[in-house]
Amino acid sequence: MNLNATLFAQMVVFLVLAWFTMKFVWPPLINALDERSKKIADGLAAAEKGKAELEAAHKRVDQELAQARNDGQQRIADAEKRAQAVAEEIKANAQAEAARIVAQAKAEAEQQIVKAREALRGEVAALAVKGAEQILKREVDQTAHAQLLNQLKAEL
């Protein structure tokens, strides 16, 4: 094997090239690779964060929809209760009005009965006086008999 100066020169050139590469070329390549891996890691982290935020947003939307449904159902139930209460109130008012009208009609009927009785008492008293007058065939003292008939009327 022949070792000559060319081989040594090539080795020196190779070592200088390796040193130059390690000193000036390799650090930017490593930095570029590190930056790229950092960007990829940041992108993956951002994607995971976005996915988590999306899931959280879906959960919030589902909760808000459920709350809106519950609120709607509650409002419907409240409206039904109010409608039922109004219907009951109207029914109670109608029953009270009917009872009032019936009571008023009964009171008026009682008044009519009392008036009719009073009128009948007066007529009976007048007829009794006429009958007694005709039976006795003499003149009757109107005032004395009127007092007697009023006493009888009061007793009746």
From Swiss-Prot:
<dbReference type="GO" id="GO:0005886">
    <property type="term" value="C:plasma membrane"/>
</dbReference>
<comment type="function">
    <text>Component of the F(0) channel, it forms part of the peripheral stalk, linking F(1) to F(0).</text>
</comment>
<comment type="subunit">
    <text>F-type ATPases have 2 components, F(1) - the catalytic core - and F(0) - the membrane proton channel. F(1) has five subunits: alpha(3), beta(3), gamma(1), delta(1), epsilon(1). F(0) has three main subunits: a(1), b(2) and c(10-14). The alpha and beta chains form an alternating ring which encloses part of the gamma chain. F(1) is attached to F(0) by a central stalk formed by the gamma and epsilon chains, while a peripheral stalk is formed by the delta and b chains.</text>
</comment>
<dbReference type="InterPro" id="IPR005864">
    <property type="entry name" value="ATP_synth_F0_bsu_bac"/>
</dbReference>
<comment type="function">
    <text>F(1)F(0) ATP synthase produces ATP from ADP in the presence of a proton or sodium gradient. F-type ATPases consist of two structural domains, F(1) containing the extramembraneous catalytic core and F(0) containing the membrane proton channel, linked together by a central stalk and a peripheral stalk. During catalysis, ATP synthesis in the catalytic domain of F(1) is coupled via a rotary mechanism of the central stalk subunits to proton translocation.</text>
</comment>
<dbReference type="InterPro" id="IPR002146">
    <property type="entry name" value="ATP_synth_b/b'su_bac/chlpt"/>
</dbReference>
<keyword id="KW-1003">Cell membrane</keyword>
<keyword id="KW-0375">Hydrogen ion transport</keyword>
<dbReference type="GO" id="GO:0046933">
    <property type="term" value="F:proton-transporting ATP synthase activity, rotational mechanism"/>
</dbReference>
<dbReference type="GO" id="GO:0045259">
    <property type="term" value="C:proton-transporting ATP synthase complex"/>
</dbReference>
<dbReference type="GO" id="GO:0046961">
    <property type="term" value="F:proton-transporting ATPase activity, rotational mechanism"/>
</dbReference>
<dbReference type="InterPro" id="IPR050059">
    <property type="entry name" value="ATP_synthase_B_chain"/>
</dbReference>
<keyword id="KW-0138">CF(0)</keyword>
<keyword id="KW-0813">Transport</keyword>
<keyword id="KW-0472">Membrane</keyword>
<keyword id="KW-0406">Ion transport</keyword>
<dbReference type="Pfam" id="PF00430">
    <property type="entry name" value="ATP-synt_B"/>
</dbReference>
<keyword id="KW-1133">Transmembrane helix</keyword>
<protein>
    <recommendedName>
        <fullName>ATP synthase subunit b</fullName>
    </recommendedName>
</protein>
<dbReference type="InterPro" id="IPR028987">
    <property type="entry name" value="ATP_synth_B-like_membr_sf"/>
</dbReference>
<keyword id="KW-0997">Cell inner membrane</keyword>
<keyword id="KW-0812">Transmembrane</keyword>
<keyword id="KW-0066">ATP synthesis</keyword>
<comment type="similarity">
    <text>Belongs to the ATPase B chain family.</text>
</comment>
<feature type="transmembrane region" description="Helical">
    <location>
        <begin position="7"/>
        <end position="29"/>
    </location>
</feature>
